[in-house]
């Protein structure tokens, strides 16, 4: 580290790095799950990809020595201030539970160390609070706070404002709920003055002192309850450092990062000074590859060794309360300001000039009509909710605020508690379905205002399509309670929004072409269920399709002339609204991917049996008349594989391709096997393998790898003794071929997990030696094994066990042998 990058020594310096961790919501609003996202490959979806690149690595970030050996594993969340979007946290809880738990643990440990936890809350689904109705703003805040309390087990002291968008009514709502402080961009301060009195001083981002907290008094609360605080404290992050971190190269070097962060420190000031920055948390690993490593080294080593205290905002506020007050900038129209719109909050309602780019000459005039259409829809749905909700709830809007408890826990006892507290006295369980439909209508009306829908370059972008899906779901639920054609009036307003892409057209066309076809009703669930059953009749009837519970009342399949005809009755129950439907289905499978499903609602069993007998008889006698008869008896509407959800659809086509795949791989393996000795001779002579044979070789050898591993997986201790596996490894190395089988890697990961479980169950020399031999073999294989969790486990084990082992090893030969093997094992894990 040279003199120019060395961080300043500072007994009064307090460093805070805030990470705003959030992802645009991506789930299908009807099934509450994220479907496959091809753009995220090789991962299933973007949440999974960014978890692998950012959220997970930050929970166990490595610091290394010069040769690249792991010195320490740091949970960055223990040392940074952070917020996670509630919708993202709900996904992590289910799909990345280890990472989720480390985030929760980090807050607990920081609270023990500093007296205040690192985590702060976030307004629920990242809507721009200044642009919401007061009632919606209130719900967004309440839901964000209740979600935080549910996860972290404590009250939040602060709340992250989406896009740091703020105005005074927003501050008033936050203060009313006990929020102590917020974090803003320095561009959002207008003027400052001492709390003790004095004249106001106009400030700009470059002149604002970001090393202290400010108090912001709220005019709306000045004449209110004298017992209630009429102010919120504000931290302004250092803008230039945040910009350099997000868009520059600061995360390449922990010393540069630390020096840049601490640059504002002034040793002449004899008071605690805050050196703080706030950025999107995804910078640490996703936007900036390996950014979590520099962050970890800066937090755990460079900053403390330079005399700075790594803390969080709440802890700093306790030792250095504000001595200055601030007035906030409110943007060009006085509606509020934000960190990502130079004009205030125009980016989420008009073509203000702020954009992510896109093609030359693109514009964002579509933002206004989209906002107007949503505001119109929101008002219509609010009227329905208020009028209809009065029949189910003591106070409909209070019930909406309390509904977050059900969103977080949909178990029967949670529903019973909710309705006992919020439902009208005597509300019967059979009325819960309508009540839940109203609440879900409101939930999606809130979700449709997610800021991402307006942030990006075009109306037809993925994020805007997502908020349109929320609107469609809210509409679908609202239509149960209204005879008015709400959708047509909404779509008429969307027609005023024009995409920059000529082929996409206007908002109405996008809605009709891209949104309406993906709307889900019970018939699509039936179609999905029966096609899944026909695809694999050996498995049991699926009991669930996503959150829908499926009870098969009866079903039968008849086959004739290569046509399968399935007929049956199902009872479906929504796991969200508890709505129940009894439906009869008739599905013809004409071979390959050609399915035709027709669904009849509330069909009497006698009528169902009669139809089934008639159709089965025609299939047996004149199969060519089956489809015309189905159309005659059941109508012209039908569903196909096109209407199946993405995961199952991919499985259907993969299964259909499998015989061709196996035949092709078999032929390739045969031809490669015939040429293998010649190709090995070429390699010995230093000659280049032809591209065709390289491709054939990787296909062939990866197939063989899977076959060998499948045989060895039940007895993993024999892996290192397998001559066939060793020969395969040597041949791949000689020929320069990559072993990249996903299936093979999966089996190797399971074997590694098996060794970890053995070592965890009994810390013995044999268990350590078996794992060492396995990892030593893996280092010879041209295949990448994911070692993150193995390293985490081993690091924790050694922290807890190795000191006592080392102390006993001088007296005990068995312990000494174990210690030696563990040292060798540590080396194979890159410690």
What is each stretch, according to the model?
Residues 137-161, 224, 262-276:
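CE4/NodB-like, metal-dependent polysaccharide N-deacetylase domain
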Residues 101-118, 142, 154, 175-224, ...:
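Acidic, His- and aromatic-enriched active-site or binding-groove loops in soluble protein domains
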Residues 92-96, 187-189, 193-211, 216, ...:
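Extended, Lys/Arg-enriched charged tracts that mediate electrostatic binding to polyanionic substrates
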Residues 678-831:
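Extended alpha-helical scaffold segments
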Residues 14-19, 23-134, 139-140, 157-161, ...:
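Short, well-structured secondary-structure segments
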Residues 3-64, 87, 200-534, 561, ...:
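Active-site and substrate-binding clefts of carbohydrate-active enzymes
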Residues 163-170, 189-193, 318-322:
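Beta-rich nucleic-acid/ligand-interaction surfaces
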Residues 113-128, 151-160, 183-189, 232-241, ...:
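Core alpha/beta catalytic barrel or barrel-like domain that forms the active/cofactor pocket
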């Amino acid at each position: 580290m040279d003199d120019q990058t060395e961080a300043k020594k500072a007994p009064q310096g307090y460093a805070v790095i805030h990470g705003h961790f959030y992802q645009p919501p991506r789930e299908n609003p009807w099934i509450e799950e994220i479907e496959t996202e091809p753009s995220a490959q090789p991962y299933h979806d973007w949440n999974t990809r960014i978890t692998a690149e950012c959220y997970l690595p930050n929970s166990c970030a490595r610091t290394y020595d010069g040769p690249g050996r792991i010195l320490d594993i740091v949970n960055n969340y223990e040392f940074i201030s952070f917020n996670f979007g509630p919708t993202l946290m709900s996904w992590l809880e289910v799909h990345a539970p280890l990472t989720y738990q480390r985030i929760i643990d980090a807050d607990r440990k920081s609270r023990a160390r500093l007296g205040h936890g690192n985590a702060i809350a976030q307004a629920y689904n990242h809507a721009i609070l200044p642009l919401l109705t007061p009632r919606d703003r209130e719900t967004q805040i309440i839901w964000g706070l209740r979600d935080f309390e549910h996860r972290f087990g404590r009250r939040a002291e602060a709340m992250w404002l989406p896009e740091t968008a703020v105005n005074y009514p927003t501050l008033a709502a936050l203060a009313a709920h006990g929020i102590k402080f917020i974090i803003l961009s320095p561009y959002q301060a207008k003027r400052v003055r001492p709390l003790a009195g004095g004249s106001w001083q106009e400030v700009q981002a470059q002149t604002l002192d970001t090393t202290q907290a400010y108090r912001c008094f709220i005019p709306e609360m000045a004449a209110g309850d004298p017992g209630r605080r009429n102010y919120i404290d504000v931290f302004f992050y250092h803008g230039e450092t945040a910009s350099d971190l997000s868009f520059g190269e600061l995360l390449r070097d922990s010393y540069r990062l630390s020096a840049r962060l601490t640059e504002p420190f002034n040793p002449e000031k004899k008071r605690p000074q805050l050196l703080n920055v706030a950025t999107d948390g995804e910078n640490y690993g996703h936007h900036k590859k390996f950014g979590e490593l520099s962050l970890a080294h800066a937090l755990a080593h460079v900053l403390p060794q330079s005399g700075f205290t790594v803390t969080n905002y709440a802890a700093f506020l306790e030792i250095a309360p504000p001595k200055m007050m601030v007035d906030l900038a409110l943007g060009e129209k006085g509606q509020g300001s934000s960190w990502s719109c130079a004009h205030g909050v125009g980016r989420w309602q008009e073509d203000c000039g702020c954009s992510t780019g896109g093609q030359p000459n693109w514009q964002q005039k579509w933002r206004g009509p989209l906002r107007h259409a949503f505001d119109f829809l929101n008002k219509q749905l609010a009227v329905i909710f208020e009028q209809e909700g009065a029949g189910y709830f003591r106070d409909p809007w209070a019930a909406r605020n309390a509904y977050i408890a059900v969103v977080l826990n949909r178990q029967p006892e949670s529903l019973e508690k909710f309705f006992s507290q919020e439902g009208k006295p005597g509300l019967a369980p059979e009325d819960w379905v309508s009540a839940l439909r109203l609440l879900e209508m409101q939930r999606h009306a809130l979700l449709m205002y997610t800021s991402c829908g307006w942030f990006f370059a075009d109306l037809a972008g993925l994020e805007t399509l997502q908020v349109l899906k929320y609107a469609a779901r809210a509409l679908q639920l609202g239509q149960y309670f209204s005879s008015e054609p709400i959708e047509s009036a909404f779509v008429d307003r969307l027609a005023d929004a024009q995409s920059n892409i000529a082929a996409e057209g206007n908002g109405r066309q996008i809605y009709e072409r891209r949104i309406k076809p993906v709307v889900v009703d019970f018939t699509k669930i039936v179609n999905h269920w029966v096609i899944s059953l026909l695809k694999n009749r050996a498995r049991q009837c699926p009991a669930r399709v996503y959150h829908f519970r499926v009870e098969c009342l009866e079903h039968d399949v008849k086959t004739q002339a290569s046509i399968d005809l399935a007929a049956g009755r199902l009872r479906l129950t929504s796991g969200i609204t508890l709505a129940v439907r009894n439906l009869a289905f008739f599905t013809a499978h004409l071979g390959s991917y050609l399915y035709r499903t027709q669904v009849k609602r509330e069909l009497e069993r006698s009528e169902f049996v009669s139809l089934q007998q008639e159709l089965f008889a025609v299939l047996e006698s004149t199969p060519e008349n089956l489809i015309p008869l189905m159309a005659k008896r059941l109508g012209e509407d039908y569903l196909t594989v096109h209407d199946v959800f993405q995961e199952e659809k991919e499985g259907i086509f993969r299964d259909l391709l499998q015989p061709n795949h196996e035949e092709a791989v078999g032929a390739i393996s045969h031809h490669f096997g015939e040429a293998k000795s010649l190709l090995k001779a070429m390699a010995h002579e230093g000659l280049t393998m032809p591209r065709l044979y390289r491709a054939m070789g990787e296909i062939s050898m990866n197939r063989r790898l899977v076959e060998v591993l499948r045989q060895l997986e039940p007895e993993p201790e024999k892996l290192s003794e397998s001559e066939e596996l060793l020969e395969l490894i040597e041949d791949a190395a000689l020929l320069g071929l990559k072993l990249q089988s996903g299936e093979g890697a999966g089996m190797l990961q399971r074997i590694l997990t098996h060794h970890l479980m053995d070592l965890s169950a009994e810390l013995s020399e044999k268990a350590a030696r078996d794992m060492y031999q396995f990892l030593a073999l893996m280092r010879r294989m041209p295949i990448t094994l994911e070692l993150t969790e193995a390293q985490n486990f081993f690091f924790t084990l050694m922290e807890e066990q190795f000191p006592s082992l080392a102390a006993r090893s001088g007296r005990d030969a068995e312990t000494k042998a174990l210690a030696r093997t563990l040292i060798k094992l540590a080396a194979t894990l890159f410690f």
